[in-house]
A protein has these predicted regions:
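A generic structural signal for short, non-catalytic loop/turn and secondary-structure boundary residues
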Residues: 1, 46-50, 74-76, 99-101
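Short, charge-rich amphipathic segments
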Residues: 1-9, 91-93, 98
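Conserved mixed alpha/beta catalytic, RNA-binding, or beta-rich assembly cores of soluble enzyme
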Residues: 2-45, 60-65, 105-115
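Broad gene-expression machinery/nucleic-acid interaction feature
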Residues: 5-7, 50-54, 101-105
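A generic local secondary-structure boundary/capping motif
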Residues: 43-45, 70-71, 90-97
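Short glycine-rich, basic-tinged beta-strand/loop micro-motifs
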Residues: 46-60
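Short, hydrophobic/π-rich interface segment
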Residues: 57-86
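C-terminal edge-of-domain segments
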Residues: 76-115
Length: 115
């Protein structure tokens, strides 16, 4: 099946005090989701199950992200999660704390019929 990107949306999330990379990633994905709309699917007669949703998240410690928590946020289509090194850790040496910032991109792919 050939696909074409219909939506690319970005988001940012953070965890201020817990150094929780999953929490920051979830917030980044939710932020991106709140900026997008799929109302056009009904007009084009495209079933949500046909979509491919690529979720890309960047944090400083990708191995610390629970992919299943991110995947559970997406309620449509075939979901693919990619976590890479990115985002930002802001260290506060005086307080002994780290602010975790995650970035996310959601890419919704539509099926395209070849003529």
């Amino acid at each position: 099946m050939t696909t074409a990107r219909a939506i690319l949306e970005m988001g940012m999330g953070n965890d201020l005090h817990g150094k929780d990379y999953t929490k920051a990633a979830v917030r980044a994905v939710k932020d991106a989701m709140h900026h997008s709309s799929l109302h056009f699917l009904k007009s084009l007669n495209i079933a949500k199950e046909q979509l491919i949703v690529n979720v890309k998240v960047g944090v400083q410690k990708p191995e610390a992200v629970d992919i299943n928590k991110i995947k559970s946020l997406i309620q449509i289509g075939i979901v693919q999660i990619y976590v890479a090194e990115g985002g930002l850790d802001v260290v506060d040496d005086e307080a002994g704390d780290t602010l975790v910032i995650a970035s996310a991109a959601l890419e919704v792919m539509l099926p395209i019929l070849k003529a």
